[in-house]
Amino acid sequence: MGCFRQTRDDEDDKLRKEANKKIEKQLAKDKLLYRGTHRLLLLGAGESGKSTIVKQMRILHVNGFSPEERKQKIEDIKRNVRDAILTITGAMSTLNPPVQLEHPQNKAKVDYIQDKASQAEFDYPPIFYEYTEILWKDKGVQAAFERSNEYQLIDCAQYFLDRVHIIRQAEYTPSEQDILRCRVLTSGIFETKFSVDKVNFHMFDVGGQRDERRKWIQCFNDVTAIIFVTACSGYNMVLREDATQNRLKESLDLFKSIWNNRWLRTISVILFLNKQDLLAEKVKAGKSKIEDYFPEYARYQVPPDASSEPGEDTEVVRAKYFIRDEFLRISTASGDGRHYCYPHFTCAVDTENIRRVFDDCRDIIQRMHLRQYELL
């Protein structure tokens, strides 16, 4: 009887050892996989373009968006159209000085938009699209749109209002560009996984509004690199959540707090100077001068390392390098050689631009990863 129990105990012990071996083998495998994964944390103020960067990674490296996902985006795109026309027509009377409609008979259409389209349960009847198209062509509405830095308007307003005739169609399917442009508030933390040339990346997108930033600390552990995204076109705009704070100044303050954060002193930052297309439009229009918001711009000279695209406006080049240097001033002032800032000019809705920029960044990220695990 005792011998039988002993044999059984030996078998149980053997099974436990085999199970432990399997667990240890899996843990070692998981550890290698974990150490072989580049963790990228996307940070930046609200509406800087972080979520659009994530969408581009899906387009470039995760087979894009399925037909079902495209269908699911229709409601968000319709909401963008509604928010855009509601906001612009609503601002006409509150702007100082106010803006008048070109055609007074359109007042009834504005009243319809403000009364009906503002309701929570709005079903987008054909008359809504008809009125929206007519109002968008009204020069008074266009004049109010041109002053959109004086109120809060989503960046994609013009893009979608120009395409109402497409969006209203029953068989409408959003294009990749439509999905990239679509604005949805990010709340919480979203992880996107993808591989490039057999290298694994995990990208974490965290909401950028002030009340979302307390969640960032949850993502700081084992981060390979931070991608900080700033909207360069925000130089003449104020925050949605604080009408007293300039958007670009908020972004600079946020960058400074991240750069000097004691938990992040060894993590380098890839700086995406985003919305270069919108910055160029504003600078060339000449209506909102950077020096009116940043007086030091009046004395700024383009640095020797500046390069420009063929045919690029010289004032646009000056503007984008001024903004770059404002960020680099922060990183060099408190740099201790333990982490670095790598700036890139980006347009998040331009897939080819993001492809080129991310390809340029991959070598930097790889070096950061090797340094992180003391392999370099």
Swiss-Prot record:
Entry GO terms, CC: cytoplasm; heterotrimeric G-protein complex
Record-linked SMART domains: G_alpha
One Gene Ontology term of the molecular function aspect: GTP binding
Residue numbers spanned by region G5 motif: 346-351
Residue span(s) of domain G-alpha: 36-376
Name of the featured protein: Guanine nucleotide-binding protein G(s) subunit alpha
Pfam families (alphabetical): G-alpha
Lipidation (N-palmitoyl glycine): 2
Subunit structure of this chain's protein: G proteins are composed of 3 units; alpha, beta and gamma. The alpha chain contains the guanine nucleotide binding site.
Region called G2 motif, residue ranges: 178-186
Lipid attachment, kind S-palmitoyl cysteine: 3
UniProt binding sites for Mg(2+): 51, 186
